[in-house]
Regions:
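Ferredoxin-reductase
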Residues: 2-81
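FNR/FR-type flavoprotein reductase catalytic core
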Residues: 69-127
Length: 127
């Protein structure tokens, strides 16, 4: 786990109540698909845990639903907003334990980390 500052690069409405947020910053603590981040929001006591959809060396993509005041606050964030983020949380998925043809099942916003898992499985030679 590492605490880092990330900058909102994009915050796009995908559908009613569903958003894609792209954050730029150091993602070196994210080592496996299925991990999550905790985002500190101004005026909120608790951080917001959000699954990582996908990541590169300098950005990460989050897909989230607005289900309360905290995620509503996130949906209004403009590009350039700087966020305090705990990264590299959770165990994630171990792609070395996957079979040759893994089956991924998920639904709603819970399917977001499966995108990153599918990418890593493809890189590992799974079909």
């Amino acid at each position: 786990m590492e605490q880092r500052n990330f900058t909102v690069a994009e915050n796009t409405k995908l559908a009613a109540g569903t958003y894609r947020m792209v954050l730029t910053g150091d993602t070196s603590a994210i080592t496996r698909p299925g991990q999550f981040v905790d985002i500190r929001l101004e005026g909120r006591f608790l951080r917001r845990p959000i699954s990582v959809c996908s990541w590169t060396a300098d950005s990460l993509t989050l897909i989230y639903k607005t289900v309360g005041a905290g995620t509503e606050q996130m949906s209004a964030m403009a590009p350039g907003t700087v966020l305090d983020v705990l990264t590299g949380l959770g165990n994630g998925f171990d792609v070395t334990k996957a079979g040759a043809r893994p089956l991924l099942v998920g639904g709603g916003a819970g399917a977001a980390p499966l995108y990153g898992l599918a990418q890593k499985l493809a890189e590992a030679g799974c079909r």
